Regions:
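Conserved, mostly hydrophobic/aromatic
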Residues: 9, 48, 76, 89, ...
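Short, flexible active-site-proximal loops enriched in glycine and acidic residues
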Residues: 12-22, 53-61
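Hydrophobic faces of well-ordered beta-strands that scaffold small-molecule active sites
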Residues: 17-21, 76-79, 96-98, 127-133, ...
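An alpha-helical appendage that flanks or caps ligand/catalytic pockets
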Residues: 34-66, 106, 111-226, 257-270
Length: 270
């Protein structure tokens, strides 16, 4: 069904569809199930990509094909943090989605990704990088209040990581804050003001999110770009969404577009 929907949308949009996919966190946990395995995720990527691009596949013992599909390539972006996820992304994906707005952590993850690409026999830089995080333009104290849910959300993935890998394989700036966590209620997942975020302090909120004045946002987005980010995806679910979009559309995106154009001109001149 996912492949068919993507193939239809490719036809409607002239090949503009990308697939963003992960192991499933809240969608499965509210059903009492854990996230799916990395092996299942990798298999799903292959099946969906083949079907959308018009190739026949064998899935659960049956040969499947979308005979009308295949005009377009399907870029696949994988959401993940752990060594296994990064290795798989470096092996098969076109993009990596990191739910973080911390340039230093992004830089660490990008380095791991580049090593995974080379280990898989691909040129370093084959996989693009997206940072996904809440952004709130305005007073920092108000922004913290509206976005504190996000480090709490990310903590679910961090807890999975520290339960699976030795802590010395992961940055302390990623894992340290979950020591104070006592639990997480998925019925209040990604909810502004939820008690889920009671353990989250200002420092980690400032690092993981994009807060402050328009100039603060521009500065941090430039830091993310310098750390290896190709795309920034705003989690626009903190209130005052229309006002936030107006500021981004009127001030922040044009400034970033100008900076990107200047960087491109500089590279061309060299």
């Amino acid at each position: 069904m996912t492949a068919s929907a993507l193939a239809v949308l490719d036809e409607v949009t002239g090949g503009r569809m990308d697939l963003g996919i992960g192991r499933g966190d809240s969608a499965r946990r509210v059903l009492g199930k854990p996230p799916t395995s990395m092996a299942t995720l990798e298999e799903a990527i292959g099946v969906i990509r083949d079907l959308v691009e018009g190739r026949a596949v064998t899935f659960e013992g049956k040969e499947l094909r979308l005979p009308w599909a295949g005009r377009w390539k399907l870029p696949v972006w994988v959401a993940g943090y752990g060594p296994m996820a990064l290795a798989m992304t470096g092996r098969v994906a076109d993009g990596l989605i990191l739910q973080l707005g911390d340039p230093d952590l992004i830089r660490w993850f990008v380095d791991q990704l580049r090593q995974a690409e080379v280990a898989a026999g691909r040129p370093a830089g084959s996989v693009r990088v997206q940072a996904a995080a809440p952004a709130h333009v305005g007073e920092i104290a108000e922004g913290r209040k509206r976005t504190r849910w996000f480090p709490a959300l990310v903590s679910n993935h961090v807890v999975d990581l520290v339960n699976k890998y030795p802590r010395d394989q992961l940055p302390e700036s990623l894992t340290g804050y979950v020591r104070e966590r006592t639990g997480y209620d998925y019925h209040h997942h990604a909810e502004v003001g939820s008690d889920n975020a009671g353990f989250v302090g200002d420092e980690v909120t400032d690092r993981f999110c994009v807060l402050g004045s328009p100039q603060d946002h521009i500065r941090k987005l430039r830091e993310l770009a310098a750390a290896g980010v190709d795309q920034f995806n705003i989690y626009l679910m903190n209130g005052n969404e229309e006002e936030q979009l107006e500021v981004y559309g009127g001030e922040i995106i044009p400034a970033m577009r100008d900076a990107t154009a200047m960087a491109s001109d500089g590279r061309a001149a060299r």
